[in-house]
Amino acid sequence: MGARHGVPWLTSYLGEKIMRTASLTVLALVAAFLFSVLPAQAAMDHGSGAAHYSDRAFLSGMIAHHEGAVDMAKVFLATPKKDQDPQVTAWADDVIKVQEKEIAEMKELLKPLGGIEESAYAPMKKAMQHMLEEGKNLGANMRFVELMLPHHAMALEMSVPALLGSNNPQILNLAENIIISQAKEMRQFKAWIAEHHKK
């Protein structure tokens, strides 16, 4: 079944460019994300917000967002090794490896655009600092996973306008990679949380 028949509302919402170029996997993930994570009205608001999209603002905000994830991972990895769940440790290691690499890539992409846009970077940096203060009543493993779940959801929400508004193939590829990898990890996080709440 083609993308138009599988998710018919996406043609008008995502636009012809994305329907022509994005993979079925990405379209399915975006559709599932918009329906399951964002409130219905918020999902529709992305359509009107696409006109105000800029690559510079997206990259600047995502750098701060990624830095927040790296900070959370480092806080977790600073806990005693004996208290770390091996799966959570692997996730934290992967967050640092992948997101530090993407931070470097985004900084390179920003160079011809004028560098970091503080009006996009600073609010996200502040939001990440607030998030880092949350969940202190939880154990280290549960805290990291519980924080990563909304953190990843925010990354998906930030990436949708990039798919809608960017004309830069590298940024489109970055946004697609974020959606695919972090949606997959969100499913894993939810399964881990459900399993460990049973114990």
What do these predicted ranges mean?
Residues 3-18:
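Short, Lys/Arg-enriched N-terminal segments with co-localized hydrophobic residues
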Residues 13, 32-34, 92:
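Helix-centric, low-specificity signal for extended rod-like, repetitive segments
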Residues 17-27:
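Bacterial N-terminal signal peptides that target proteins for export
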Residues 18, 38-42:
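Sec/Tat signal peptide C-region and signal peptidase I cleavage site
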Residues 42-199:
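All-alpha RGS (Regulator of G-protein Signaling) helical domain and cognate RGS-like helical scaffolds
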